[in-house]
Design a protein with these regions (language model features):
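The feature marks the mature, well-folded catalytic cores of soluble enzymes
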Residues: 1-177
């Protein structure tokens, strides 16, 4: 980031004062972090954005993170993402249209109810897809508990999009292929 851009951002922050809050994910470069009001993971940033009294929330992260912040934001807040091309390869592995196709195929081949579970680092359409079908979102730290919950109800699970998290969680539960 060049000095001119840094100066312009500082200038706008000074003009807008409490009307703007800049949120930055941990992985942002140091120049952005220094300009930010809050630094954290996607969940912390979404929550802190919603707690802010600012009208404008600038979310320095990827699209699904800004989308999560927008879900929690007050009606009076506008979430802005500086780079609309800032995507997450994992979140883009599947969308609700493809998930529905796969989910239906799994249901057809299964003699049990299927609960969709999506890793929280996903777009809103996937989270909505899960909620509409009695599923859930999970984090890497609670994936095992979420899967156990559905398995204890006698259900099967359709897990996406984090393949490795799904496989490693299945192994930790001693599930067969």
């Amino acid at each position: 980031m060049n000095d001119d851009l840094i100066y312009k951002i500082k200038e706008k922050k000074e003009i807008l004062k409490d009307k703007i809050t800049i949120l930055a994910h941990h992985y942002q470069n140091i120049e952005i972090v220094k300009l930010s009001d809050v630094i954290g993971d996607s969940y912390k940033l979404a929550v802190e954005g919603s707690r802010s009294k600012s009208e404008f929330i600038v979310f320095c992260g990827v699209k699904f993170m800004a989308e999560g912040a927008a879900i929690l934001a007050k009606d009076t807040q506008k979430i802005v993402i500086p780079d609309m091309k800032a995507g997450c390869p994992m979140a883009e592995m599947i969308d609700a249209i493809r998930a529905k196709e796969v989910y239906e195929r799994i249901r057809e081949g299964c003699n049990k109810e299927v609960a969709p579970v999506v890793y929280v680092n996903s777009y809103g359409d996937m989270k909505n897809f899960c909620g509409e079908r009695g599923g859930a979102t999970c984090t890497s730290s609670n994936a095992k508990k979420i899967l156990e919950y559905y398995f204890n109800q006698g259900k099967r699970v359709f897990f996406s999009p984090d393949y490795n998290l799904g496989i490693n969680t299945a192994k930790s539960l001693n599930l067969k292929k």
